[in-house]
C-alpha cells in the first residue's frame, strides 16, 4: 500500500500473473499451456499450488472472482491504514495487489476522489474512524460509506472531471489539483474563511 499516494500511485515496475478462472458466459479462463514461460515458473511451486483449497478449474487458475471485471475499469484505490487520506485514481486497468487495499468503481469517480482527499474528509474521519494506536487511521469501507457527499450539478461534476484528467495526463501537479478542488468544495458546502482556516490548520494540505 505504500505505493498508493494522494490522487495517484507509484508503479514499482512489477507485474502480476493473473491466471484467472474466467467469467461464465463472458470470458474464458486462462489456459496455462498458452503461456509456457509462465507455466515453467509456476511449476516450481506445484506442490503448494496443487494442495491449496481455493484453486480454479486447474491448480494453475485462481479461484472464481465475481468482480474480476472491476479491475479493468477506472477506479479509486486506497490502503486501509494511513496517517492521511491517500485515495488514488487508476484509469488504465492496472491491478493494485495488496492485502489491505480497496477499490471503488462507479460513476463520478473524479468528484469522489477530490472529496475523499480533501481536508473536509480527513476531519470527518478523525471523528468517526478507528485508529491503530500509533497515529494512523484505518480507512475502513464501512466508515467511508458514512461520509456525507455534497450533491453537485452536472456542470460541477464535469469541472472536477476536467481537473482530474489534467492531473492524469500530467498537465497539473497533485498540489495544483488539491488547491483547485478544495477551493471548489469549500464553496459547495458554504464554508466561510474562518471555517476553511480551521479545517486546513487541523489537517494541512498533504502532497
Model-derived features: where do they sit?
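Polybasic, glycine- and aromatic-enriched phosphate-binding surface used to engage nucleic acids
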Residues: 1-158, 205
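Non-catalytic DNA-recognition/assembly elements of restriction-modification systems
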Residues: 37, 151-207
Amino acid at each position: 500500500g505504500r505505493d498508493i499516494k494522494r490522487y495517484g500511485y507509484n508503479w514499482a515496475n512489477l507485474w502480476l500473473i493473473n491466471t484467472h478462472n474466467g467469467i461464465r458466459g463472458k470470458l474464458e479462463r486462462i489456459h496455462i499451456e498458452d503461456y509456457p514461460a509462465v507455466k515453467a515458473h509456476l511449476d516450481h511451486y506445484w506442490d503448494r499450488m496443487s494442495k491449496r483449497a481455493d484453486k480454479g478449474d486447474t491448480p494453475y487458475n485462481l479461484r472464481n472472482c465475481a468482480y474480476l471485471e472491476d479491475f479493468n475499469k477506472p477506479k479509486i484505490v486506497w490502503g486501509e491504514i494511513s496517517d492521511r487520506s491517500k485515495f488514488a485514481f487508476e484509469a488504465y486497468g492496472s491491478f493494485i495487489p495488496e492485502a489491505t487495499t480497496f477499490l471503488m468503481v462507479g460513476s463520478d469517480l473524479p468528484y469522489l476522489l477530490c472529496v475523499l482527499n480533501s481536508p473536509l474528509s480527513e476531519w470527518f474521519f478523525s471523528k468517526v474512524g478507528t485508529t491503530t494506536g500509533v497515529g494512523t487511521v484505518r480507512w475502513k469501507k464501512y466508515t467511508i460509506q458514512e461520509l456525507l457527499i455534497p450533491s453537485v450539478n452536472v456542470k460541477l461534476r464535469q469541472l472536477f472531471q476536467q481537473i482530474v484528467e489534467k492531473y492524469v495526463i500530467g498537465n497539473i501537479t497533485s498540489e495544483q489539483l488539491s488547491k483547485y478542488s478544495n477551493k471548489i468544495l469549500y464553496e459547495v458546502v458554504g464554508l466561510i474563511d474562518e471555517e476553511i482556516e480551521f479545517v486546513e490548520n487541523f489537517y494541512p494540505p498533504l502532497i
